């Protein structure tokens, strides 16, 4: 395809990761199924470069985001007699995140204006899917808004679609949007990453450059960085770099010495805030992870499963 014919929408937004493929599925049978919902500009089943055996997953890229939405709305999908799991693909860099594989229905929205009301959040986010609950967090004592909120959808795909977008404007102000994870989901992401570093990163052209020995789709694990928090976190989520600890209200542990102050208020001036800066909240961790019903905002730019048919990295401990 020439540049003049290339779709205008970014490729990353038009790409789906397809997990749980039958080992019998080929590029052709994958294409035959998913082209029912639009024009495919690329379709590939990822294979071991040596044995040519399917890795149990692949990617399809549509000509438009609208076609991607149509395919996702048609779930569940069955290819060659096997139910598969399509997810919006995330970039190689983003897929390195410890919990990139987790599917959640709740997002954290930080950096919202004090005069932001529920209808502002609903007006913006309802374009991504059906909203079930909107919670604007306030200080229990003073009632003052703390600068962040949670929005819960009825489908994880709404969350996946939101977090791969780099810019979000609510009530006339750029905000920080991330997946919101419960304490249990955080623990799951941590355990799936720990000790498996380097077992599943891959890159290179379409079929080559794979690392690791496990086959995705038959119990094999793929992972990115070992140890939740990686070198920045010293083994614990956040650590010195990405902490969302501290003592907030409502049983939530928000805080940290950077983008949240010790009372759990969002402090946009102190954060490494900006769509192109990775969105890490700088500063020390100021509290433990204890307590029930906690939600943590994960590092920015996660979407679920990551990768590209040309240069990709899959960073999860998900099993099919």
From Swiss-Prot:
User: Bias regions of kind Low complexity — which residues?
Assistant: 308-320
* Positions of the UniProt region annotated as Disordered: 182-218, 271-320
Which UniProt keywords are listed?
Repeat, RNA-binding
What is a single Pfam family found in this protein's UniProt entry? Answer: RRM_1
Please state what the protein is called. Heterogeneous nuclear ribonucleoprotein A1-like 3
Where is the RRM domain positioned along the sequence?
14-97, 105-184
Q: Which GO terms describe its biological process?
A: mRNA splicing, via spliceosome
Gene3D superfamilies associated with the record: 3.30.70.330
GO MF annotations, alphabetized:
RNA binding
Bias-annotated ranges (Gly residues): 197-218
PROSITE patterns (UniProt xref): RRM (PS50102)
One Gene Ontology term, aspect cellular component: catalytic step 2 spliceosome
């Amino acid at each position: 395809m020439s540049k003049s014919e290339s779709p205008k929408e970014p490729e990353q937004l038009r790409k789906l990761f397809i997990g749980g493929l039958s080992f019998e599925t080929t590029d052709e049978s994958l294409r035959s199924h998913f082209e029912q919902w639009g024009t495919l500009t690329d379709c590939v089943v990822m294979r071991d470069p040596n044995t040519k055996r399917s890795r149990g997953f692949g990617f399809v890229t549509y000509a438009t985001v609208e076609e991607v939405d149509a395919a996702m709305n048609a779930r569940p999908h069955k290819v060659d007699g096997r139910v598969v799991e399509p997810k919006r693909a995330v970039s190689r860099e983003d897929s390195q995140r410890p919990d990139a594989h987790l599917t959640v229905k709740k997002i954290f929205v930080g950096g919202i204006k004090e005069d932001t009301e529920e209808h502002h959040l609903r007006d913006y986010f309802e374009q991504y899917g059906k909203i079930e609950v909107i919670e604007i967090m306030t200080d229990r004592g003073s009632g003052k808004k703390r600068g962040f909120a949670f929005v819960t959808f009825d489908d994880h795909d709404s969350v996946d679609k939101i977090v791969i977008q780099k810019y979000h404007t609510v009530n006339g102000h750029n905000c920080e949007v991330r997946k919101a994870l419960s304490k249990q989901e955080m623990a799951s992401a941590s355990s799936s990453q720990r000790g498996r570093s380097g077992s599943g990163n891959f890159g290179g052209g379409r079929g080559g450059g794979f690392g690791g020995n496990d086959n995705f789709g038959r119990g094999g694990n793929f992972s990115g960085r070992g140890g939740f928090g990686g070198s920045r976190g010293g083994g614990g989520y956040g650590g010195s770099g990405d902490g969302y600890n501290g003592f907030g209200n409502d049983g939530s542990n928000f805080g940290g010495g950077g983008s949240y102050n010790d009372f759990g208020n969002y402090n946009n001036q102190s954060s490494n805030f900006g769509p192109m800066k990775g969105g890490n909240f700088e500063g020390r961790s100021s509290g433990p992870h204890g307590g029930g019903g906690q939600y943590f905002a994960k590092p920015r730019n996660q979407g679920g499963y990551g990768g590209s048919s040309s240069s990709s990295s899959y960073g999860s401990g998900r099993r099919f």
